[in-house]
Amino acid sequence: MADGSNREYLNLSTGQLVELALARGEGELTANGALVAKTGERSGRSPNDRFIVKEPSSEADIEWGPVNKPFEADAFTALWNRVEAYLADKDTFVSNLEVGASKEHYQPVTVTTEYAWHQLFARNLFIVPTEFNAADKPTWQIINAPGFVCNPERDGTHSDATVILNFAERKVLLAGLKYAGEMKKSMFSVQNFLLPAKGVLPMHCSANVGSDGDTTLFFGLSGTGKTTLSADPKRFLIGDDEHGWAPGGVFNIEGGCYAKCIDLSQKNEPVIWDAIRFGTVLENVVTDENRVPDYTNSTLTENTRAAYPLEHIAQRKEENCGAEPHAVVFLTCDVSGVLPPVSKLTKEQAAYHFLSGYTAKVGSTEMGSTAAIQSTFSTCFGAPFFPRPAGVYAELLMKRIESFGSQVYLVNTGWTGGPHGIGKRFDIPTTRAIVDAIVSGELKDVETEYLEKLNLHVPVAIPGVDSNLLNPINTWEDKQQYAEFAQHLAESFQKNFEKYQVPDSIKNAGPNA
């Protein structure tokens, strides 16, 4: 429609957006009906290009540093105006959406995009309300202009692209980026800032619920199994990535899923496989000559994605919310092969491991990361998205666990019998059997063995799981080497934890170096 008419398309349906995306050459239809789009050189988040406007209303509550970098308010206004002027002679797509499946805690947001497929993504991942902004709250605005090229000297940005959050003006500016995940993570960061002030814990986790209403949460970084394990054929999905835990219940912050597609198989992940159909956006997935997606192909990126609305999942919780969780699972992908497949945590240990966020970058979502797998500590299992000091979130977690009596487990979806390259990764059926035992409550009062170096209690038996796997030293041929690796891991935990100002009860809840 680039005929000079400069239309603003408001609240278009899925079919209309797919039609326009194809007509405008933004993507192609695949054999399974999904729309596939390419994002160019930025096929993941760009953390170096993310800023928060430094202004009086929020300045004192933000933990400024390499994750939350300050941006001048005047420079933001000038850049916002420049991007608006750039979009003024383009067709744009606009939707009125919400973030937060809670009458009390939702945020209304108007999303304006240059691309039709970005608008489809926003409508898949955010919530399309039956009545927009029923409580008449002040509305957030997102502008996404991938064709706008930033000039660092003129605009004060880090590169030719940027993501900037402005809490005072309720604005999110995305310029120069095609990777759609930036939109969802921006509004997640917004809720991560706003919710704690209302006593609600925002969480980088997935959630599902059983037929008797029991909720389980799965925390973890990208690639650790959040989406795979929460998409359980025996349970109902609440959401796969972002939730709030308020007194009385858990709610999804989103209205869709953003699942990793690399090596996706119908056998191992039937729920995700079946959700990829007309209306789904596939990002950077390579197709063959018949337009059949090749999920094993990582030519463009390891971080291939499918964005679909929750409606594409048959077994889901209609209201996108649930009761407070009986079980909370911290997923860690241990590349050293030292951690047991499952441990039971006290509330102090839960706070310790929540703050530590130990895991590996597996098929990292960040731009420029190589395929090499490395261990990392990511505070709250999602450091890039939490604007407030980490202690704020840890305190809220302990409060919620204590008041409801949730049991927390540390589950290793990484390696055993040796580090990455020598040992082998726990297979999905083993982890599923462990998770089944957790959600059924079988592990709540199970007999445990104490691993002193790791300061962890591990079950001695779990139905459907080889008991030899439960204490990791049994899976290593060289026991001395295991002891050395365990010592090294304990030391790295302690070194990482030095930065936290927390009570001794939490400080002493980690591994013993």
Swiss-Prot record:
It catalyses: oxaloacetate + ATP = phosphoenolpyruvate + ADP + CO2. Mn(2+) binds at residues 185, 204, 241. Transmembrane segments: none annotated. ATP binds at residues 185, 204, 220-228, 269, 305, 431. Substrate binds at residues 45, 179, 185, 305. CDD domains: PEPCK_ATP (cd00484). InterPro entries: PEP_carboxykinase_ATP (IPR001272), PEP_carboxykinase_C (IPR013035), PEP_carboxykinase_N (IPR008210), PEPCK_ATP_CS (IPR015994). This is Phosphoenolpyruvate carboxykinase (ATP). Monomer. Its cofactor is Mn(2+). It is an enzyme of class 4 (lyase). Binds 1 Mn(2+) ion per subunit. Pathway: Carbohydrate biosynthesis; gluconeogenesis. Keywords: ATP-binding, Cytoplasm, Decarboxylase, Gluconeogenesis, Lyase, Manganese, Metal-binding, Nucleotide-binding. One of its GO terms (biological process) is gluconeogenesis. It comes from Shewanella piezotolerans (strain WP3 / JCM 13877). Belongs to the phosphoenolpyruvate carboxykinase (ATP) family. Its EC number is 4.1.1.49.
